[in-house]
């Protein structure tokens, strides 16, 4: 996917997905230490909810701290907040779907990610195969793309929780998978929230 695609001005495609997956993992209780390291590697701002509680700016909005001091377009801060709120909401739904993922599936997926000889494409295929296995557990009343997005990020969370050293690889594979298969849905989700 072209990284220059964006939702009007603001964040590019991969940055939207970076923030969405990072926010989901953060809201889902992944280990803080690994997330802090990952957050520093992101080319966009990421912030910790716990660090920001009770910290307001003069205009009354919540403050945000940057792990990376890269240049951000002026209107992207509000877009980042919207993406973070979407991620938090999806994580809450994911908590309700969590029981649908069997521990054996998580262990198998973690073992596949530990295989150093697998290419990024092979890892995405392993993730797709795992998603096919849990597809029957998608809530019937939920839009398929939404369920697929949540389950993709939920699998990433469970693998990272099972083997924290895999967080970086699982994160990047998940972002790439979403950008290839679900980005139109993600873009529309962000656009709808911004309206």
UniProtKB/Swiss-Prot annotation:
Its main location: cytoplasm. Keywords: Acetylation, Apoptosis, Cytoplasm, Membrane, Mitochondrion, Mitochondrion outer membrane, Phosphoprotein, Ubl conjugation. Pfam families: BID. GO terms for molecular function: ubiquitin protein ligase binding. The modification N-acetylmethionine is found at residue 1. InterPro entries: Bcl-2-like_sf (IPR036834), Bcl2_BH3_motif_CS (IPR020728), BID (IPR010479). A motif (BH3) lies at residues 87-100. The record marks 59-60, 75-76, 98-99 as: Cleavage. GO terms for cellular component: cytoplasm; cytosol; membrane; mitochondrial membrane; mitochondrial outer membrane; mitochondrion. The modification Phosphoserine is found at residue 78. It is found in: Cytoplasm; Mitochondrion membrane; Mitochondrion outer membrane. Residues 58-77 are annotated as: Disordered. GO terms for biological process: apoptotic mitochondrial changes; establishment of protein localization to membrane; extrinsic apoptotic signaling pathway; hepatocyte apoptotic process; mitochondrial ATP synthesis coupled electron transport; mitochondrial outer membrane permeabilization; negative regulation of intrinsic apoptotic signaling pathway in response to DNA damage; positive regulation of apoptotic process. Residues 58-69 have a biased composition (Polar residues). Disulfide bonds: none annotated. Induces caspases and apoptosis. Counters the protective effect of BCL2. Intact BH3 motif is required by BIK, BID, BAK, BAD and BAX for their pro-apoptotic activity and for their interaction with anti-apoptotic members of the Bcl-2 family. Apoptotic members of the Bcl-2 family. PANTHER family: BH3-INTERACTING DOMAIN DEATH AGONIST. Forms heterodimers either with the pro-apoptotic protein BAX or the anti-apoptotic protein BCL2. Interacts with PLEKHN1. This is BH3-interacting domain death agonist. The gene is Bid.
């Amino acid at each position: 996917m072209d990284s220059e695609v964006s939702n009007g001005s603001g964040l590019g495609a991969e940055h939207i997905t970076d923030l969405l997956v990072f926010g989901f993992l953060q809201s889902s209780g992944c280990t803080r230490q690994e997330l802090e390291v990952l957050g520093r590697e992101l080319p966009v701002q990421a912030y910790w909810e716990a660090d920001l509680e009770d910290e307001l700016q003069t205009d009354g909005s919540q403050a945000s701290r940057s792990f990376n001091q890269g240049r951000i377009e002026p209107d992207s801060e509000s877009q980042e907040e919207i993406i973070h709120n979407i991620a938090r909401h999806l994580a809450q739904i994911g908590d309700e779907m969590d029981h649908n993922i069997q521990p054996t599936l998580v262990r198998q997926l973690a073992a596949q990610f530990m295989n150093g000889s697998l290419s990024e494409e092979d890892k995405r295929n392993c993730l797709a195969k795992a998603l096919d296995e849990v597809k029957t557990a998608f809530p019937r009343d939920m839009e398929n793309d939404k369920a697929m997005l949540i389950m993709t990020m939920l699998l990433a969370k469970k693998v990272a929780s099972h083997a924290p050293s895999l967080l970086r690889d699982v994160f990047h594979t998940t972002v790439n998978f979403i950008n290839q298969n679900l980005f139109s849905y993600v873009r529309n989700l962000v656009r709808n929230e911004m309206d």
